Amino acid sequence: MKKMSEIIATLKKDYIYNLMIKDKRQDGRGFKDFRELKLETNVISKAEGSAKVTLGNTQVLVGVKLQTGTPFPDSQDEGVIITNLELNPIASPEFEPGPPREDAIEMARVVDRGIRESGAIDIKKLCITVGESVWIVFIDVHILNNDGNIIDASCLAAIAALMTTMVPNEQQGLGENVPLAMKEMPVGITLAKIGSKLMVDPSLDEEAVCETKLTIVSSSDGSVAGMQKMGPVPLTEAELFEAIDMAIEKAAEIRGLYLEGLAKSE
């Protein structure tokens, strides 16, 4: 006999499927529509940069700290980027205290890869003395509330925090504080596949019933900087190209809104 939770899950999945047949979603959005997006910057006074993103009911807080350290042996004239993501227990009953979960590590890698592969930060300008001293950039991502699509909210919050980051030169006697040298604004867009449909910004309910999720991080020139698939069901070649087109188009829209929001916050 099925448990009540399994029965509810089946009914919810059937409900979402039936809506999709009519080209509708649970919250009334179209398949290419994001939920309401809100950006706040400089929300942590002791951080070098910070931002909070609210995507629907999903909330993510990012703080950026810089400290000096030694470079890696194979990149002695480049700074270091370290990204951590924490699934706080207050964000969801599914998130428990303890060591980082595998999915948290995976999501941190997606955020980190998008920043690195797009060349978002000019890491050579983080070099203080070649082979001896560089700035290490710590990007700490905290999930405050999970209502779906944590990765996109995390990517957006991380970039917004970096774009408001000041390098604390004065602390090290290196002159005046300067803005972190940014070269690019990558945007991550996650699509969920349910049946034959692809939709951006899946809610928590949509994530629970989707067969596969695909996150695509793109740069301002439309090039793909990173891609991560989650879920057992494969995508056809046609679905993959459709997903890339949708992601690049949506990223351009989000990027424009973000730059406008950042300009207003200065």
Swiss-Prot record:
Pfam families (alphabetical): RNase_PH, RNase_PH_C
Record-linked InterPro entries: ExoRNase_PH_dom1 (IPR001247), ExoRNase_PH_dom2 (IPR015847), ExoRNase_PH_dom2_sf (IPR036345), Exosome_comp_Rrp42_subfam (IPR050590), PNPase/RNase_PH_dom_sf (IPR027408), Ribosomal_Su5_D2-typ_SF (IPR020568), Rrp42_archaea (IPR020869)
Cystine pairings recorded for this chain: none
Keyword Cytoplasm applies: yes
Main location group: cytoplasm
Keywords recorded for this protein, A-Z: Cytoplasm, Exosome
A GO term, aspect molecular function: mRNA 3'-UTR AU-rich region binding
Subcellular location: Cytoplasm
Gene3D superfamilies in UniProt: GHMP Kinase, N-terminal domain (3.30.230.70)
General function of this protein: Non-catalytic component of the exosome, which is a complex involved in RNA degradation. Contributes to the structuring of the Rrp41 active site.
Family from the record: Belongs to the RNase PH family. Rrp42 subfamily.
Subunit note: Component of the archaeal exosome complex. Forms a hexameric ring-like arrangement composed of 3 Rrp41-Rrp42 heterodimers. The hexameric ring associates with a trimer of Rrp4 and/or Csl4 subunits.
Protein name: Exosome complex component Rrp42
Organism: Methanosarcina mazei (strain ATCC BAA-159 / DSM 3647 / Goe1 / Go1 / JCM 11833 / OCM 88) (Methanosarcina frisia)
